[in-house]
UniProtKB/Swiss-Prot annotation:
Provenance organism: Dinoponera quadriceps (South American ant)
Modified sites of kind Alanine amide: A28
Annotated localization: Secreted
Protein role: The synthetic peptide has weak antimicrobial activity against Gram-negative bacterium E.coli ATCC 10536. It does not show antimicrobial activity against the Gram-positive bacteria B.amyloliquefacies S499, L.monocytogenes 2231 and S.aureus ATCC 29213, against the Gram-negative bacteria P.putida BTP1 and P.aeruginosa PaO1, or against the fungi S.cerevisiae, R.mucilaginosa, C.cucumerinum, F.oxysporum and B.cinerea.
Expression (tissue specificity): Expressed by the venom gland.
Alphabetized UniProt keyword annotations: Amidation, Antibiotic, Antimicrobial, Secreted, Toxin
Domain of life from the UniProt record: Eukaryota
Name under which the protein is recorded: M-poneritoxin-Dq4a
GO biological process: defense response to bacterium
A single GO molecular function term of this UniProt record: toxin activity
Predominant cellular place of this UniProt entry's protein: secreted
GO cellular component, one term: extracellular region
Amino acid sequence: GLKDWWNKHKDKIVEVVKDSGKAGLNAA
C-alpha cells in the first residue's frame, strides 16, 4: 500500500525535497 511505498522511498524523497528547497532559495 501507500504506507509501504512511502517507507521504501521516503529517504530519497526527503533528499530530493531538500535539494529542491535549496535550489529554490539559491535561485531567489
